[in-house]
């Protein structure tokens, strides 16, 4: 399935049915009174969050959605049938924005939440409403209300507790596969991960969601590489796990590149709690590991954890640390 996280769609509510002009007809009654029924209400447009959906791909190719119109009123004071509301399911984490993309209309942060974005048009009035003492046979009714229509933007921000960040090929996908049941595509070349991958970590009777965000490169916040498209998905995370390739010749530059992209994208990302991990320590001798850790700690003023996703060295410790941070932030 294609991962689609932003679409623009057109939506319209159902129009109300027209009121009816009708007169009572019955044997032996020459002039029956007005009995035109009202038009039915038009259907509304309702968005609903659904955790079984994880992409906006259903809105990629069909972009026009209209609720059902109400039926016209009928004789014998029978109202028209109301139109069916249109329910559009979206993934949890979807945000609805105005046509210009500037105004947030709704943010689905929980499952099975509904948002009525357009109300269906009211039905028109039948001629029975217009009977007066001086006009016993009104030939007047009203048309149904024309429902609102609009273009909107749907944007998906994944809901995860932990975001995995780092340059391409830093070992993020391997980390995800080791700590969860997720099976991301993994290979020894940059940009293996082309879409965010989600997995659930189970530890000590607790669980949390972790997202592997496609690799960042210099200039990601300006649209280079893949990072700009997916940086928004880590805005909701409680903590970031920053993996650095221990086999790199310049771990400081690698770290600074990713940090610069985060800080350039938003101040919100800049202040996220960060767990720094020097990965691929299985290919380094102890002296190299300590040398690179000291360099990183001097620049970051943070603890740097040596790990290896290849042989699972230190990974469980990182998972427990992330869980502790998540619990502290939530409670």
Curated annotation (Swiss-Prot):
Can you give the residue ranges of the OBG-type G domain? 160-327
Domain Obg residues, every copy: 1-159
Name the major location: cytoplasm
* InterPro entries named among the record's database cross-references: G_OBG, GTP-bd, GTP-bd_Obg/CgtA, GTP1_OBG_dom, GTP1_OBG_dom_sf, OBG_GTPase, P-loop_NTPase
Q: What family does the database annotate? A: Belongs to the TRAFAC class OBG-HflX-like GTPase superfamily. OBG GTPase family.
Residue numbers binding GTP: 166-173, 191-195, 212-215, 279-282, 308-310
Where is the protein situated, by its record's location annotation? Cytoplasm
Protein name as catalogued:
GTPase Obg
Q: Which cofactor does it need?
A: Mg(2+)
**Whom does it interact with, and what assembly results?**
Monomer.
Any one GO biological process? ribosome biogenesis
Query: Which NCBIfam families does the record match to this protein?
Result: Obg_CgtA, PRK12297.1, PRK12299.1
Q: Name one GO cellular component term.
A: cytoplasm
Annotated positions binding Mg(2+): 173, 193
Pfam families, alphabetized: GTP1_OBG (PF01018), MMR_HSR1 (PF01926)
């Amino acid at each position: 399935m294609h991962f689609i996280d932003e679409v623009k769609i057109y939506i319209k509510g159902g129009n109300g049915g027209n009121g009816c002009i009708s007169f009572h007809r019955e044997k032996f009654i020459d002039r029956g009174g007005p009995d035109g029924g009202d038009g039915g209400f038009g259907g509304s447009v309702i968005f609903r969050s659904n955790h079984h959906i994880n992409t906006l791909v259903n809105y990629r190719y069909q972009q026009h959605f209209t609720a059902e119109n109400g039926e016209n009123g009928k004789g014998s004071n029978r109202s028209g049938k109301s139109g069916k509301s249109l329910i559009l399911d979206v993934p949890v984490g979807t945000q609805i924005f105005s046509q210009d993309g500037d105004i947030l209309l709704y943010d689905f942060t929980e499952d099975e939440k509904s948002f009525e974005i357009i109300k269906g048009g009211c039905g028109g009035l039948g001629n029975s409403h217009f009977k007066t003492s001086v006009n016993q046979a009104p030939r007047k009714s009203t048309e149904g209300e024309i429902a609102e229509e609009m273009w909107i933007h749907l944007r998906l921000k994944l809901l995860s507790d932990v975001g995995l960040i780092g340059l391409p090929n830093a070992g993020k996908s391997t980390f995800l596969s080791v700590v969860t049941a997720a099976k991301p595509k993994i290979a020894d070349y940059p940009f293996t991960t082309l879409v965010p991958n989600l997995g659930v970590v189970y530890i000590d009777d607790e669980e949390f969601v972790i997202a592997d965000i496609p690799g960042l490169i210099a200039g990601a916040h300006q649209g280079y590489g893949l990072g700009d498209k997916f940086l928004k998905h880590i805005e909701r995370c409680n903590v970031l796990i920053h993996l650095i390739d221990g086999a790199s010749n310049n771990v400081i530059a690698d770290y600074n590149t990713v940090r610069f992209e985060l800080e350039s994208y938003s101040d919100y990302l800049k202040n996220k709690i960060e767990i720094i991990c020097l990965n691929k320590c299985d290919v380094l001798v102890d002296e190299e590991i300590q040398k690179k850790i000291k360099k990183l700690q001097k620049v970051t003023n943070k603890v740097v954890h040596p790990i290896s996703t290849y042989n699972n060295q230190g990974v469980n410790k990182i998972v427990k640390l992330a869980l502790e941070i998540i619990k502290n932030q939530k409670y």
